[in-house]
Curated annotation (Swiss-Prot):
Gene name as annotated: infB
Keyword Thylakoid: no
Chain segments carrying region G1: 424-431
GO molecular function, one term: GTP binding
Role: One of the essential components for the initiation of protein synthesis. Protects formylmethionyl-tRNA from spontaneous hydrolysis and promotes its binding to the 30S ribosomal subunits. Also involved in the hydrolysis of GTP during the formation of the 70S ribosomal complex.
Subcellular location as annotated: Cytoplasm
Protein name: Translation initiation factor IF-2
Pfam families the UniProt entry points to: EF-G_D2, GTP_EFTU, GTP_EFTU_D2, IF-2, IF2_assoc, IF2_N
Organism of origin: Proteus mirabilis (strain HI4320)
Transmembrane segments: none
Amino acid sequence: MTDETVKSLAEEIQTPVERLVQQFADAGIKKTVSDSVSQKEKETLLAWLNRDKESTSQPEKLTLQRKVRSTLSVPGTGGKNKSVAIEVRKKRTYVNRDAVEKAQAAEQAQREAEEKARREAEEKAQREAQEKAQREAEEKAKREAEEAKKKAEEKAKREAEEAKREAAELAKREAAEKDKVKQNEKPKADKADQEKARRIAEQAELKRKTEEAQRRKAEEEARIAAEKARRLAEENAEKWTSDTSSETEGTDYHVTTSRYARDAEDESDAEVEGGRGRGRAAKAPRPKKNNRHSEKADREEARAAGRSNKKGKGRKNSTLQQGFNKPAAAVNRDVVIGETISVADLANKMAVKGSEVIKTMMKMGAMATINQVLDQETAQLVAEEMGHKVILRRENELEEQVMNDRDTSDEMAVSRAPVVTIMGHVDHGKTSLLDYIRSTKVASGEAGGITQHIGAYHVKTDKGEITFLDTPGHAAFTSMRARGAQVTDIVVLVVAADDGVMPQTIEAIQHAKAANVPVVVAVNKIDKPEADPDRVKTELSQYGILPEDWGGETQFIHVSAKQGLGIDELLDAILLQAEVLELKAVKEGMASGVVIESYLDKGRGPVATILVREGTLNKGDIVLCGFEYGRIRAMRNELGKEVQSAGPSMPVEILGLSNVPSAGDEATVVRDEKKAREVALYRQGKFREVKLARQQKSKLENMFANMEEGKVSELNIVLKTDVQGTCEAITDALVKLSTDEVKLKIIGSGVGGITETDATLAAASDAIILGFNVRADASARRIIEQESVDLRYYSVIYSLIDEIKSAMSGMLEPEYKQEIMGLAEVRDVFKSPKFGAIAGCMVVEGNIKRNNPIRVLRDNVVIYEGELESLRRFKDDVNEVRNGMECGIGVKNYNDVRVGDMIEVFQVIEIKRSID
């Protein structure tokens, strides 16, 4: 081993080089930084350090003795007090915890080492046994193979000798025959020679084949013997492993014995309690129960029976006494569980108390109350834990029956118009582009020039029919934009040539990819001088949108919504993409579709915009939309004209539903209105039960959160909008504004005008009413004025979110910052009869002002914090002393001012906070 230097040794043990050199010197070894260190010198240094530690070590045990002497006056004989000397001795022993811990650690290490050695010995014995079994099996296989080979060789040798003997006899017979026909003609002799040669060749070939067959047979027997030996070795190894595992399993003996001991204890308890009852026959031994939840109840009943017999020992037993025999075994029931069930109902079905179910759930790690609703999986686990059989029931059988009882046409699917969604960033010209196609002015009618709900339009062009969905581009309408991507066939991504790719553009690409919908890019505002289409292509290529001229699959069309440039090319690209997709739908039969948008009209009631997917929607049909149902009383297209029917890819507004459906719900035409009502009510109840079942359980982290709820400010809001989709978008945007200090709570939201109920709710809960494109009626305005409720109207979502954000910022607690104004050094201390100790100071930094909070610093440590009571300069009271001047300072309620102290004057500044 090569020696290392002092420097490298210091780096290795992570200690300063100078300290290591000094330690070598203390140990009697003179070294420099570059000198080498041998192993012997290292050991010498280590011994010196250990001896040094031992010399300075503390004693392991310390005993303290204390004596307390006192006198006690006690009354004596003759009325005189007598003094008695009392001595109290106390002895206390203190043990060094480090020594005890070291001893325990040493014992633990010794036990671990013994356990490790035992395990290693067992593993070694197991390995040796396995190797021994394997060697024996291999030797046995080798012996069998050699014996088989030897037998095969002997057999082949015998057969070869027999063949040789037969050949000799044959040659002898041929020689005799040859002598017989020696006098025959020469042609006959030639023929005999040929025959002889042929027979010899056949015999040689036969001999070769025989030897080959014998060799193959010997090899096969050897292979079979080796395989047999290998299997025998594996069986021995498995047997050894199973024996070892059975020995290991033997350590769980205490589990089973404890169970048997518990059963025996139950039986002995029953016998003892039964023996207490006078006049009662001996109780037969009870068979072992298979339900562990009834053991405690059995013991309690046995004790109760013993107590009752003990109380009535003097009472004569009646011959007509009604008896009750407790079931000998637990009753396992078939429990039918629906999608949701309360704890009380589950207990009734299992015929047990609700407290037993709650105990079982607590053992499983879940807290529950008697009225809490459980989901199907939780109820199944609880019932199976209590030993019952569970039968899961589907509660949507009626819904499936209604959906199956529909007239769907068996006709062939025909081509339908493509559903095209126009997506893009806000103000990139989506609605203006659709305007030019429809030759209308929709954008001018939008508040603030931005689209705030989905517009569905069916457009007939010279090239064909197209259904357009115009989605908002604002960030708050993410859910609406995602909903548009789910029902569409083609996405037209509008990107402004002068603005490029923006956040909502990226989001639209993600929605289109998630829905697996092809994209056609419309580069808008191409007529502007600062337009840069190549920049748009480059930015979109980073997100997987490659143009066709770059080798991609996406069509890029340059358009101008103002001048109408490229509109025909865009329509051609859309219809070309639709032909590639081969969009088809069944035109006849009961219709089905999707709710695009819904709102509450004051004169017409609930109105829903439905995009038909297949079938034909007729006036008078019974429609089931999510939680709502109804018969179609009227049907209008996007232009407001009455229509009698609508085919696939047609958007229509329908009237006649029971309430406003949620946007995105499936709309299905059914046969029976009564069954449709039952399905709608079932869905409402199921939604409520599932919502209750998903309530947060009581966990430790929630307890702390609930404890701090009182410190959180709340802003209550009642929100009313014109359409359902806008209500969802604004709700999501407002909820995201909540912080840990200010919580925004939407206590009521809906579609339609602000009613008297909304105003009463806001007044009772101290809430703000927000109206988005809606107004309050006369009765609501009267209550709002009487109760002084804050009512605000909005038509653009930007201003709504900004004002709510500023209101929440006002509810935040301000931050307080301390600003140091001046610093004075104490040069001398004077005594004043009025103020006590007066510090004669020199202002070294800033200014000193009267009545400001101060800190007294001694050696840069704060020793007092209070208020400046007196500030004088040459016996005159002053309000301020500037830098470089002398002054006298009196600190309120503090007299321990010393020369050299620093007096720091500061002020507290309040800083308003805002929500980002």
